[in-house]
Amino acid sequence: MFMTYQPKKRQRSKEHGFRKRMKTKSGRNVLKRRRQKGRKRLTA
């Protein structure tokens, strides 16, 4: 067995980043919910 999580900054931000969230309606809803909840960090 090997470690399955091998982090990459670029891949992470491409998939879960702010700009990706802003692209879609549902993504904007995610940001809205996280703002309402008072999250310090909205996205990865």
Swiss-Prot record:
Regions of biased composition (Basic residues) lie at 7-44
> Which InterPro entries does this one have?
Ribosomal_bL34, Ribosomal_bL34_CS
Q: Which residues form the signal peptide?
A: none
Task: Tell me one GO biological process term.
Answer: translation
Q: Where is this region: Disordered?
A: 1-44
Keywords associated with the record:
Ribonucleoprotein, Ribosomal protein
Q: Which Pfam families match?
A: Ribosomal_L34 (PF00468)
A Gene Ontology molecular function term for this protein is: structural constituent of ribosome
Quick check: keyword Ribosomal protein in the entry? Answer: yes
The record's annotation in Gene3D superfamilies points to: 1.10.287.3980
What highest taxon heads this organism's lineage? Bacteria
Q: Does the keyword Ribonucleoprotein apply?
A: yes
GO-annotated cellular components: ribonucleoprotein complex; ribosome
Q: Which HAMAP family match?
A: Ribosomal_bL34
Protein family according to the UniProt entry? Belongs to the bacterial ribosomal protein bL34 family.
What's this protein's name? Large ribosomal subunit protein bL34
Give the species: Clostridium perfringens (strain 13 / Type A)
GN (gene name)? rpmH
